[in-house]
């Protein structure tokens, strides 16, 4: 009597699927743990991977040290943005933000602590949340994205306390002016808007594309990245990457780079930017290109500077984008190695 042979899953099918996933992966977001020793990276499949920076940077590091210590499914769609508080990792996807305890994640217990959805205009609306911003002085979180509004959430109660309206198209990016309670937002409508949190109103608008020296009509008017340092702001996207004096709404430096930039940050006396192309660009405030440091991804979407004082040995710049890798720069001048999903 012959026994029926059970249908077997072809050997290697799971590995082929994982290889295809990695091939088509985009890493949208990063966040460093409060202790500074771990890095969270969120991808287009809704996964968050946790890497041990301390293990990867160790003199005894092996290839395995550059792989995630844990990977978990966080959202049904892409993980567009992440930030960390002193205890929590906050992640945003389509229509909602979730909270996770760092202590539990590191024990590999990846159950969400809570989830919140901003009060959208209709129950059918599920807009992406492109940007998260912590406002430490008021213990709040600002969310912005596809519904063209900035929503403020009280981190203690989990309630949404205000919605700021003014953008006419979806919002890409947020930045905080720490010395004054003001938030900047940049969007697809080509405007950077400044909001005074004390009065919950828009107090300044800069329509970047209307300034001839910044305008690049062939790239569009969208603002994809911005950063602020007291009276100064740098922003880019469709228009050229430009340094602005905020009080006078004046563009002071237009940086000579053709590729649209997707992330920008101030660092010491430099401006770091990245976007289309594999390089992290180091700019003097005068507009001079000090360095272009190549990475392993064909396009970059996120830069993260780990400056946690608790872990000076993990002080690195990490860059991610259109690949399954997170490049690690141990000094700003070269890529030391890459972490990989």
From Swiss-Prot:
SMART domains: WD40 (SM00320). Keywords: Apoptosis, Developmental protein, mRNA processing, mRNA splicing, mRNA transport, Nucleus, Phosphoprotein, Repeat, RNA-binding, Transport, WD repeat. GO terms for molecular function: RNA binding. The modification Phosphoserine is found at residue 180. InterPro entries: THOC6, WD40/YVTN_repeat-like_dom_sf, WD40_repeat_CS, WD40_repeat_dom_sf, WD40_rpt. PROSITE patterns: WD_REPEATS_1 (PS00678), WD_REPEATS_2 (PS50082), WD_REPEATS_REGION (PS50294). Gene3D superfamilies: YVTN repeat-like/Quinoprotein amine dehydrogenase. Component of the THO subcomplex of the TREX complex which is thought to couple mRNA transcription, processing and nuclear export, and which specifically associates with spliced mRNA and not with unspliced pre-mRNA. Plays a key structural role in the oligomerization of the THO-DDX39B complex. This is THO complex subunit 6 homolog. It comes from Rattus norvegicus. The gene is Thoc6.
């Amino acid at each position: 009597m012959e026994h029926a042979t059970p249908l077997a899953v072809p050997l290697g099918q799971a590995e082929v699927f994982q290889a295809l996933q990695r091939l088509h992966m985009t890493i949208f977001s990063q966040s460093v743990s409060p202790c500074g020793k771990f890095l969270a990276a969120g991808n287009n499949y809704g996964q968050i991977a946790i890497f041990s920076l301390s293990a990867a940077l160790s003199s005894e590091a092996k290839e395995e040290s550059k792989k995630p210590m844990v990977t978990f499914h966080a959202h049904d769609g892409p993980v567009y943005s992440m930030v960390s508080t002193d205890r929590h990792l906050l992640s945003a996807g389509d229509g909602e933000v979730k909270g996770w305890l760092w202590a539990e994640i590191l024990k590999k217990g990846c159950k969400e602590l809570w989830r919140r959805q901003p009060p959208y205009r209709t129950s059918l609306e599920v807009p992406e949340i492109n940007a998260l911003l912590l406002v430490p002085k008021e213990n709040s979180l600002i969310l912005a994205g596809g519904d063209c509004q900035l929503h403020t959430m009280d981190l203690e109660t989990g309630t949404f306390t205000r919605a700021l309206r003014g953008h006419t198209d979806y919002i890409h990016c947020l930045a905080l002016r720490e010395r004054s309670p003001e938030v900047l937002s940049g969007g697809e409508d080509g405007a950077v808007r400044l909001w005074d949190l004390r009065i919950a109103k828009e107090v300044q608008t800069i329509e970047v594309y209307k300034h001839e020296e910044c305008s690049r009509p062939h790239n569009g008017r969208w603002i994809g990245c911005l950063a602020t340092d007291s009276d100064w702001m740098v922003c880019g996207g469709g228009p050229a990457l430009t340094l602005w004096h905020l009080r006078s709404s004046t563009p002071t430096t237009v940086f000579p780079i053709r590729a649209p930039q997707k992330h920008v940050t101030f660092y010491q006396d430099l401006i770091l930017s990245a976007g289309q192309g594999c390089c992290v660009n180091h700019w003097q405030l005068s507009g001079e290109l000090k360095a272009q440091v190549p990475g392993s991804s064909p396009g970059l979407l996120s830069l993260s500077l780990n400056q946690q004082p608790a872990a000076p040995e993990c002080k690195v710049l990490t860059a991610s984008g259109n690949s399954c890798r997170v490049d690690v720069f141990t000094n700003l001048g070269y890529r030391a190695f890459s972490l990989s999903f």
